[in-house]
């Protein structure tokens, strides 16, 4: 199965969610001094939303750098976003921004660490998404 590619800050919320989903995954490094992640096959991006309710700064800088690499961007097939409902209309807005800019489907959104239902939905949805891509 093709991987999930994700970014998680030092809070580790997205990382903990990815661990619970238990599918193949690659992590975009937190520190820009670390070696850049290069993907070599199609992937779904899982991204937290930042900015406290504003669209400015909603997509983490590390994710922008990752997607600005044409090689990485070419393999992007979909996006899943994490967020905080306290952000109101900007809840999970990083997913909206990336899906629109990269012309890929926005597959799912979840709050903070996600619930057991979110984990099951993502696991099932990702599996079905890749099965549809191969038929």
Swiss-Prot record:
Q: Which InterPro entries match?
A: Flavoprotein-like_sf (IPR029039), RNR_Ib_NrdI_bac (IPR020852), RNR_NrdI (IPR004465)
Gene3D superfamilies in the record:
3.40.50.360
Q: What is one GO biological process annotated to this record?
A: protein modification process
Which GO molecular-function terms appear in the entry? FMN binding
Domain of life, source organism: Bacteria
Name of a matching Pfam family: Flavodoxin_NdrI
Report the family membership.
Belongs to the NrdI family.
| Role played | Probably involved in ribonucleotide reductase function.
Please report the name of this protein according to its UniProt entry.
Answer: Protein NrdI
State the organism named in the record: Pectobacterium atrosepticum (strain SCRI 1043 / ATCC BAA-672) (Erwinia carotovora subsp. atroseptica)
Q: Which gene codes for it?
A: nrdI
């Amino acid at each position: 199965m093709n991987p999930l590619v994700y970014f998680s800050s030092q809070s580790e919320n997205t990382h903990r969610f990815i661990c619970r989903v238990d599918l193949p995954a690659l992590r975009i490094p937190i520190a820009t001094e670390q070696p850049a992640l290069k993907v070599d096959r199609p992937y779904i991006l899982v991204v937290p939303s930042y900015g406290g309710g504003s669209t400015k700064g909603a997509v983490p800088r590390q994710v922008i750098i990752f997607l600005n690499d044409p090689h990485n961007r070419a393999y992007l097939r979909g996006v899943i976003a994490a967020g905080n409902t306290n952000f109101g209309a900007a809840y999970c807005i990083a997913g909206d921004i990336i899906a629109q800019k990269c012309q890929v489907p926005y597959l799912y959104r979840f709050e903070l660490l996600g619930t057991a239902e979110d984990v099951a939905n993502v696991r099932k949805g990702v599996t079905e998404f890749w099965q549809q891509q191969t038929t």
